Protein backbone atom coordinates (compact mmCIF):
# COMPACT_ATOMS: atom_id res chain seq x y z
CA UNK A 1 0.00 0.00 0.00
CA UNK A 2 3.00 2.31 -0.36
CA UNK A 3 2.53 4.79 -3.22
CA UNK A 4 6.24 5.24 -3.97
CA UNK A 5 6.84 1.47 -4.07
CA UNK A 6 3.92 0.89 -6.46
CA UNK A 7 5.07 3.64 -8.83
CA UNK A 8 8.68 2.43 -8.78
CA UNK A 9 7.57 -1.05 -9.82
CA UNK A 10 5.52 0.19 -12.79
CA UNK A 11 7.07 0.14 -16.26
CA UNK A 12 6.22 3.69 -17.31
CA UNK A 13 6.98 5.22 -20.72
CA UNK A 14 4.79 8.34 -20.91
CA UNK A 15 6.75 11.54 -20.01
CA UNK A 16 3.94 12.98 -17.86
CA UNK A 17 3.62 9.72 -15.94
CA UNK A 18 7.41 9.66 -15.42
CA UNK A 19 7.12 13.14 -13.92
CA UNK A 20 4.59 11.82 -11.40
CA UNK A 21 6.97 9.00 -10.47
CA UNK A 22 9.77 11.56 -9.91
CA UNK A 23 7.42 13.68 -7.77
CA UNK A 24 6.55 10.64 -5.64
CA UNK A 25 10.24 9.73 -5.26
CA UNK A 26 11.14 13.29 -4.22
CA UNK A 27 8.30 13.28 -1.67
CA UNK A 28 9.43 9.90 -0.32
CA UNK A 29 13.07 11.01 0.02
CA UNK A 30 12.29 14.41 1.54
CA UNK A 31 9.23 13.74 3.72
CA UNK A 32 8.86 9.95 3.77
CA UNK A 33 5.07 9.86 3.51
CA UNK A 34 2.26 11.38 1.45
CA UNK A 35 3.47 9.93 -1.86
CA UNK A 36 -0.04 8.91 -2.95
CA UNK A 37 -1.47 12.30 -1.93
CA UNK A 38 1.16 14.27 -3.85
CA UNK A 39 0.50 12.20 -7.01
CA UNK A 40 -3.26 12.75 -6.73
CA UNK A 41 -2.72 16.49 -6.22
CA UNK A 42 -0.33 16.74 -9.18
CA UNK A 43 -2.74 14.72 -11.35
CA UNK A 44 -5.62 17.02 -10.44
CA UNK A 45 -3.55 20.12 -11.25
CA UNK A 46 -2.71 18.67 -14.68
CA UNK A 47 -6.36 17.78 -15.24
CA UNK A 48 -7.49 21.32 -14.42
CA UNK A 49 -4.83 22.89 -16.65
CA UNK A 50 -5.89 20.79 -19.67
CA UNK A 51 -8.96 22.99 -20.22
CA UNK A 52 -6.80 26.16 -20.42
CA UNK A 53 -4.34 24.52 -22.82
CA UNK A 54 -7.23 23.54 -25.12
CA UNK A 55 -8.43 27.15 -25.01
CA UNK A 56 -5.04 28.26 -26.34
CA UNK A 57 -3.55 29.68 -23.13
CA UNK A 58 0.26 29.65 -22.99
CA UNK A 59 1.70 27.08 -20.51
CA UNK A 60 3.88 29.77 -18.88
CA UNK A 61 0.78 31.72 -17.84
CA UNK A 62 -0.70 28.57 -16.26
CA UNK A 63 2.63 27.89 -14.48
CA UNK A 64 2.69 31.47 -13.18
CA UNK A 65 -0.85 31.04 -11.84
CA UNK A 66 0.10 27.82 -10.06
CA UNK A 67 3.14 29.53 -8.49
CA UNK A 68 0.88 32.26 -7.09
CA UNK A 69 -1.48 29.58 -5.78
CA UNK A 70 1.49 27.84 -4.14
CA UNK A 71 2.44 31.05 -2.30
CA UNK A 72 -1.13 31.42 -1.01
CA UNK A 73 -1.31 27.75 0.02
CA UNK A 74 2.01 27.93 1.93
CA UNK A 75 0.90 31.16 3.61
CA UNK A 76 -2.34 29.49 4.69
CA UNK A 77 -0.46 26.44 6.01
CA UNK A 78 1.93 28.60 8.07
CA UNK A 79 -0.97 30.60 9.50
CA UNK A 80 -2.79 27.43 10.55
CA UNK A 81 0.26 25.52 11.81
CA UNK A 82 0.35 24.59 15.50
CA UNK A 83 3.69 24.91 17.25
CA UNK A 84 4.73 22.00 19.46
CA UNK A 85 7.89 23.72 20.69
CA UNK A 86 6.07 25.58 23.49
CA UNK A 87 4.30 22.46 24.78
CA UNK A 88 5.57 20.39 27.71
CA UNK A 89 7.22 17.02 27.08
CA UNK A 90 4.05 14.98 27.75
CA UNK A 91 1.89 17.04 25.37
CA UNK A 92 4.62 17.06 22.73
CA UNK A 93 4.96 13.28 22.95
CA UNK A 94 1.19 12.79 22.64
CA UNK A 95 1.23 14.97 19.52
CA UNK A 96 4.07 12.94 17.98
CA UNK A 97 2.20 9.69 18.70
CA UNK A 98 -0.90 11.11 16.97
CA UNK A 99 1.22 12.07 13.94
CA UNK A 100 2.60 8.52 13.76
CA UNK A 101 -0.93 7.09 14.08
CA UNK A 102 -2.15 9.33 11.23
CA UNK A 103 0.64 8.00 9.01
CA UNK A 104 -0.17 4.38 9.93
CA UNK A 105 -3.95 4.86 9.49
CA UNK A 106 -3.89 4.17 5.75
CA UNK A 107 -1.34 1.36 6.01
CA UNK A 108 -1.34 -2.36 6.67
CA UNK A 109 -0.51 -1.72 10.35
CA UNK A 110 -3.60 0.46 10.96
CA UNK A 111 -5.04 -2.19 13.31
CA UNK A 112 -1.85 -2.02 15.44
CA UNK A 113 -1.31 1.75 15.19
CA UNK A 114 -1.32 2.36 18.98
CA UNK A 115 1.41 -0.24 19.52
CA UNK A 116 3.64 0.81 16.62
CA UNK A 117 3.20 4.58 17.03
CA UNK A 118 4.63 4.21 20.56
CA UNK A 119 7.52 2.14 19.18
CA UNK A 120 8.25 4.69 16.41
CA UNK A 121 8.24 7.67 18.79
CA UNK A 122 10.54 5.81 21.19
CA UNK A 123 12.95 5.09 18.32
CA UNK A 124 13.09 8.72 17.14
CA UNK A 125 13.39 10.02 20.72
CA UNK A 126 16.45 7.80 21.16
CA UNK A 127 18.34 9.83 18.53
CA UNK A 128 20.24 12.99 19.34
CA UNK A 129 17.76 15.88 18.99
CA UNK A 130 20.13 18.19 17.10
CA UNK A 131 20.89 15.61 14.37
CA UNK A 132 17.95 13.16 14.10
CA UNK A 133 19.94 11.08 11.60
CA UNK A 134 17.41 8.65 10.05
CA UNK A 135 20.25 6.27 9.09
CA UNK A 136 20.72 5.54 12.80
CA UNK A 137 17.28 3.90 12.99
CA UNK A 138 17.31 0.38 11.58
CA UNK A 139 14.42 -2.00 10.99
CA UNK A 140 15.21 -5.72 11.03
CA UNK A 141 12.57 -8.21 9.86
CA UNK A 142 12.28 -11.54 11.70
CA UNK A 143 9.64 -13.99 10.48
CA UNK A 144 7.64 -15.86 13.08
CA UNK A 145 5.70 -14.77 16.12
CA UNK A 146 3.03 -12.11 16.41
CA UNK A 147 3.32 -8.54 15.10
CA UNK A 148 3.02 -7.33 18.69
CA UNK A 149 6.16 -9.33 19.57
CA UNK A 150 8.10 -6.56 17.80
CA UNK A 151 10.37 -4.57 20.09
CA UNK A 152 12.93 -1.77 20.17
CA UNK A 153 16.66 -2.18 20.79
CA UNK A 154 18.41 0.93 22.10
CA UNK A 155 21.43 0.55 19.85
CA UNK A 156 22.45 -1.39 16.73
CA UNK A 157 21.22 -4.90 15.93
CA UNK A 158 21.87 -7.12 12.94
CA UNK A 159 21.46 -10.75 11.98
CA UNK A 160 24.38 -13.05 12.80
CA UNK A 161 26.53 -13.50 9.72
CA UNK A 162 27.77 -16.82 8.32
CA UNK A 163 30.24 -18.30 10.80
CA UNK A 164 33.00 -20.86 10.42
CA UNK A 165 33.91 -23.69 12.79
CA UNK A 166 35.07 -22.37 16.14
CA UNK A 167 32.44 -19.66 16.67
CA UNK A 168 30.70 -21.83 19.31
CA UNK A 169 33.62 -21.24 21.70
CA UNK A 170 33.52 -17.46 21.29
CA UNK A 171 32.04 -15.37 24.13
CA UNK A 172 28.52 -14.10 23.38
CA UNK A 173 28.33 -11.23 25.87
CA UNK A 174 30.58 -8.27 26.79
CA UNK A 175 30.28 -5.19 28.97
CA UNK A 176 32.04 -2.07 27.61
CA UNK A 177 33.85 -4.00 24.84
CA UNK A 178 36.44 -2.54 22.49
CA UNK A 179 35.19 -2.90 18.91
CA UNK A 180 37.47 -3.22 15.88
CA UNK A 181 35.99 -2.63 12.40
CA UNK A 182 37.90 -3.95 9.38
CA UNK A 183 37.62 -4.03 5.62
CA UNK A 184 40.13 -6.85 5.05
CA UNK A 185 39.96 -10.62 4.56
CA UNK A 186 41.17 -12.78 7.41
CA UNK A 187 41.46 -16.18 5.76
CA UNK A 188 43.87 -18.28 3.74
CA UNK A 189 43.18 -17.50 0.11
CA UNK A 190 43.17 -20.05 -2.69
CA UNK A 191 45.51 -19.46 -5.63
CA UNK A 192 44.13 -17.38 -8.45
CA UNK A 193 42.99 -19.14 -11.60
CA UNK A 194 45.86 -20.19 -13.88
CA UNK A 195 48.41 -19.24 -11.19
CA UNK A 196 51.73 -21.02 -11.50
CA UNK A 197 54.57 -21.52 -9.02
CA UNK A 198 57.83 -23.08 -10.17
CA UNK A 199 59.92 -24.74 -7.47
CA UNK A 200 63.26 -26.53 -7.52
CA UNK A 201 62.67 -28.74 -4.48
CA UNK A 202 59.99 -29.51 -1.85
CA UNK A 203 61.57 -27.12 0.68
CA UNK A 204 60.73 -24.19 -1.62
CA UNK A 205 57.05 -25.16 -1.59
CA UNK A 206 57.12 -25.46 2.21
CA UNK A 207 58.63 -21.97 2.54
CA UNK A 208 55.83 -20.52 0.36
CA UNK A 209 53.12 -22.18 2.49
CA UNK A 210 54.86 -21.13 5.73
CA UNK A 211 55.09 -17.52 4.50
CA UNK A 212 51.36 -17.48 3.76
CA UNK A 213 50.53 -18.81 7.23
CA UNK A 214 52.91 -16.34 8.85
CA UNK A 215 51.23 -13.43 7.04
CA UNK A 216 47.77 -14.24 8.37
CA UNK A 217 49.08 -15.02 11.89
CA UNK A 218 50.86 -11.64 11.90
CA UNK A 219 47.55 -9.89 11.07
CA UNK A 220 45.73 -11.79 13.82
CA UNK A 221 48.45 -11.01 16.39
CA UNK A 222 48.22 -7.28 15.66
CA UNK A 223 44.44 -7.31 16.10
CA UNK A 224 44.74 -9.11 19.47
CA UNK A 225 47.50 -6.71 20.61
CA UNK A 226 45.22 -3.71 19.90
CA UNK A 227 43.02 -4.86 22.80
CA UNK A 228 39.87 -5.49 20.73
CA UNK A 229 37.15 -7.73 22.20
CA UNK A 230 34.93 -7.69 19.10
CA UNK A 231 36.14 -7.84 15.49
CA UNK A 232 33.78 -7.10 12.60
CA UNK A 233 34.76 -7.15 8.95
CA UNK A 234 32.96 -6.42 5.68
CA UNK A 235 34.99 -9.26 4.12
CA UNK A 236 35.20 -12.94 5.17
CA UNK A 237 36.79 -14.05 8.44
CA UNK A 238 37.82 -17.69 7.86
CA UNK A 239 37.89 -20.72 10.14
CA UNK A 240 41.55 -20.22 11.10
CA UNK A 241 40.90 -16.65 12.32
CA UNK A 242 37.60 -17.67 13.97
CA UNK A 243 39.34 -20.37 16.05
CA UNK A 244 42.31 -18.08 16.79
CA UNK A 245 39.97 -15.40 18.19
CA UNK A 246 37.87 -17.99 20.09
CA UNK A 247 41.01 -19.20 21.91
CA UNK A 248 41.60 -15.61 23.06
CA UNK A 249 37.99 -14.83 24.11
CA UNK A 250 37.36 -12.50 21.17
CA UNK A 251 34.08 -12.38 19.23
CA UNK A 252 34.32 -12.01 15.45
CA UNK A 253 31.93 -11.73 12.49
CA UNK A 254 32.80 -11.49 8.80
CA UNK A 255 30.75 -10.47 5.75
CA UNK A 256 28.91 -7.81 7.76
CA UNK A 257 26.48 -5.84 5.58
CA UNK A 258 27.80 -2.39 4.58
CA UNK A 259 24.72 -0.61 5.98
CA UNK A 260 25.02 -2.38 9.35
CA UNK A 261 28.75 -1.65 9.42
CA UNK A 262 28.05 2.04 8.82
CA UNK A 263 25.56 2.16 11.71
CA UNK A 264 27.98 0.38 14.07
CA UNK A 265 30.71 2.82 13.02
CA UNK A 266 28.53 5.89 13.66
CA UNK A 267 27.18 4.56 16.96
CA UNK A 268 30.34 3.16 18.56
CA UNK A 269 32.87 5.69 17.24
CA UNK A 270 35.07 2.96 15.70
CA UNK A 271 36.99 3.72 12.49
CA UNK A 272 36.98 1.12 9.69
CA UNK A 273 40.54 -0.05 9.00
CA UNK A 274 41.83 -1.32 5.64
CA UNK A 275 45.07 -2.58 7.20
CA UNK A 276 46.15 -3.92 10.59
CA UNK A 277 49.43 -2.00 10.50
CA UNK A 278 49.39 0.74 13.13
CA UNK A 279 46.19 -0.60 14.69
CA UNK A 280 45.81 1.21 18.03
CA UNK A 281 43.18 1.65 20.71
CA UNK A 282 42.31 5.10 19.27
CA UNK A 283 40.50 3.57 16.27
CA UNK A 284 38.44 1.15 18.38
CA UNK A 285 34.83 1.87 19.32
CA UNK A 286 32.75 0.85 22.31
CA UNK A 287 29.21 0.33 23.61
CA UNK A 288 27.79 -0.32 27.07
CA UNK A 289 26.85 -3.90 26.30
CA UNK A 290 27.17 -6.42 23.47
CA UNK A 291 25.33 -9.72 23.34
CA UNK A 292 24.23 -12.34 20.86
CA UNK A 293 20.63 -13.43 21.37
CA UNK A 294 18.09 -15.75 19.76
CA UNK A 295 15.15 -13.97 18.11
CA UNK A 296 12.71 -16.37 16.47
CA UNK A 297 14.72 -18.81 14.37
CA UNK A 298 17.66 -16.40 13.95
CA UNK A 299 20.63 -15.27 16.05
CA UNK A 300 21.13 -11.50 16.35
CA UNK A 301 24.10 -9.39 17.47
CA UNK A 302 23.04 -6.46 19.67
CA UNK A 303 25.20 -3.41 20.44
CA UNK A 304 23.30 -1.65 23.24
CA UNK A 305 23.53 1.94 24.55
CA UNK A 306 26.27 3.21 22.27
CA UNK A 307 27.81 6.37 23.80
CA UNK A 308 29.25 7.96 20.66
CA UNK A 309 25.98 8.48 18.81
CA UNK A 310 22.51 7.40 19.90
CA UNK A 311 20.88 4.80 17.65
CA UNK A 312 17.88 2.47 17.66
CA UNK A 313 16.77 -0.72 15.91
CA UNK A 314 13.20 -1.96 15.59
CA UNK A 315 12.97 -5.76 15.50
CA UNK A 316 9.85 -6.36 13.41
CA UNK A 317 8.08 -9.71 13.91
CA UNK A 318 5.26 -11.28 11.91
CA UNK A 319 4.08 -14.32 9.97
CA UNK A 320 4.50 -14.01 6.21
CA UNK A 321 7.55 -12.33 4.66
CA UNK A 322 5.31 -10.21 2.40
CA UNK A 323 3.43 -8.90 5.43
CA UNK A 324 6.64 -7.95 7.24
CA UNK A 325 8.06 -6.26 4.13
CA UNK A 326 4.90 -4.15 3.81
CA UNK A 327 4.96 -3.40 7.55
CA UNK A 328 8.58 -2.21 7.24
CA UNK A 329 7.60 0.33 4.56
CA UNK A 330 4.74 1.54 6.78
CA UNK A 331 7.09 2.01 9.75
CA UNK A 332 9.61 3.86 7.59
CA UNK A 333 6.91 6.36 6.63
CA UNK A 334 5.87 6.84 10.27
CA UNK A 335 9.49 7.30 11.39
CA UNK A 336 10.06 9.97 8.74
CA UNK A 337 6.89 11.82 9.76
CA UNK A 338 7.75 11.85 13.49
CA UNK A 339 11.32 12.90 12.68
CA UNK A 340 9.96 15.70 10.47
CA UNK A 341 7.65 16.91 13.26
CA UNK A 342 10.53 17.00 15.76
CA UNK A 343 12.74 18.95 13.35
CA UNK A 344 10.09 21.49 12.27
CA UNK A 345 8.32 21.72 15.67
CA UNK A 346 5.13 22.54 13.74
CA UNK A 347 2.13 20.51 12.61
CA UNK A 348 -0.91 21.36 10.46
CA UNK A 349 -4.22 19.59 11.22
CA UNK A 350 -5.63 17.63 8.28
CA UNK A 351 -9.12 17.79 6.80
CA UNK A 352 -10.48 15.22 9.23
CA UNK A 353 -9.08 16.91 12.36
From Swiss-Prot:
Predominant place of localization: cytoplasm
The record's section on InterPro entries has: Chaperone_TCP-1 (IPR017998), Chaperonin_TCP-1_CS (IPR002194), Cpn60/GroEL/TCP-1 (IPR002423), GroEL-like_apical_dom_sf (IPR027409), GROEL-like_equatorial_sf (IPR027413), TCP-1-like_intermed_sf (IPR027410)
Coiled coil keyword on record:
no
- Which GO MF terms does the UniProt record name? ATP binding; ATP hydrolysis activity; ATP-dependent protein folding chaperone; unfolded protein binding
Tell me the Pfam families matching this sequence: Cpn60_TCP1
Q: Which PROSITE patterns match?
A: TCP1_3
Q: Where in the cell is it found?
A: Cytoplasm
Example GO CC term: the record gives: cytoplasm
Keyword annotations from UniProtKB, A to Z = ATP-binding, Chaperone, Cytoplasm, Nucleotide-binding
Record bears the keyword ATP-binding: yes
Primary role: Molecular chaperone; assists the folding of proteins upon ATP hydrolysis. Known to play a role, in vitro, in the folding of actin and tubulin.
* Assembly: Heterooligomeric complex of about 850 to 900 kDa that forms two stacked rings, 12 to 16 nm in diameter.
By sequence similarity, the record places it as follows:
Belongs to the TCP-1 chaperonin family.
Protein's recorded name: T-complex protein 1 subunit eta
- In which organism is this protein found? Tetrahymena thermophila
At the highest ranks, the source species' classification is: Eukaryota, Sar, Alveolata, Ciliophora, Intramacronucleata
